[in-house]
Each structure stands twice: as structure tokens, then as C-alpha cells.
Amino acid sequence: PVAREEFPDKDVTVRGSVVDDFGAKADPADVRVDGAPPDHPAGLLLLLHKPIGLVCSHDEREGPNVYSLLPPRWRTRNPQVTSIGRLDKDTSGLLLLTDQSELVHRLTSPKHKVPKVYRATVSTGLSPALVPLFASGTLQLKDEKAPCAPAGLKIISPREAELTLTEGRYHQVRRMFASQGAEVLTLHRARFGHLELGD
């Protein structure tokens, strides 16, 4: 049903007809408020295919951001829409956005071990010895106190790999490969938990 209290002093239509029975059921895709689709209630969750060149920060001084891709009404929501984890400016792929702080915590906390799958191309040939090293949970990154959590590495070709992480440290994928002498040239997040990008 369309709730009158949701839209006080607004012109609500369903398939172009003004609504006078706010108890009637309607397909959300057919509802318009003052001629525009209604804003979603609290609990917004968006799956975005982030392009290269955008940052995941609300601070516009850091450059063009992913929030510029959203309709204006979602950019001004309260609570604010924010990314669940971040992808750096040079990384593309699956990015989740939400206005639910509890969901952000649940999906980014290392204790929940939510898998994130990345595809990387690197500057040098990848040794099969990296597979057990990344899986061991002993890989120590520079300036980090604790070693990386075990990570699944699948070598697709000499310079391409798929890496599954259950934690999200700063530039972790790039730093893991760099620690072994391989610079990441392209990086794409293909999956977050059970969600993945289609073709």
C-alpha cells in the first residue's frame, strides 16, 4: 500500500492517476511523487559497477566520487549513503552502497569473514609458490602488526590471478602482490559475499 504519511503535501500518482485510496496496493515501479519515483525508505542497498577514476569518499577535494553517479535525492539522504568498504580510484568492479551503518559493519568486519573476489593483472609472472604463501595466513605486509588473513589465490595465466580475501586492509591486494615483487596493473572486484556483477 501507498502510505499517505510518507508523502504529506505531495501529489502521489499510480500509472498517472492521482491516488485517493492510500490502502490500495501498487507496483512500486508505477508510483510517482510529484512526478518522480519516490525515494526509497531507510534500508537502501545498491550494487554499483564502479568505473576506474572515481573515489569512494564523500570529500569532493579527493576528486570525482562514486556518489556523483546517484540520483540527487539519494545523495542527500539522511542517514547518508556510504560505500561498504572502498575501492581505490584505479580499481573497478562491484561496490555496495547503503544507508545502514549496521550493515556496513557486518559486511566489513574481519570477524564475519565475508569473501571478496578480485581479478588482477600483474607486471611479472606469478609463481605457483604464491598460492600456499597467500593461503598460509603468514604473509606480513610492511607497516602492519598482524599478518594477512589466509587468502585464496587462483593463478589464471602467468600474469593474471583471482584473489579471495576475507578482510579489507588499505590497498591490500596491491600490497600483497607488491610484497612478492609483482605490481598490480589492473584490479577489478568481481564478487562481494554472494553478490557478483553480471556481464
Write out the residue ranges for each language-model feature:
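Basic, flexible Lys/Arg- and Gly-enriched helix-loop patches that mediate nucleic-acid binding at interfaces
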Residues: 1-199
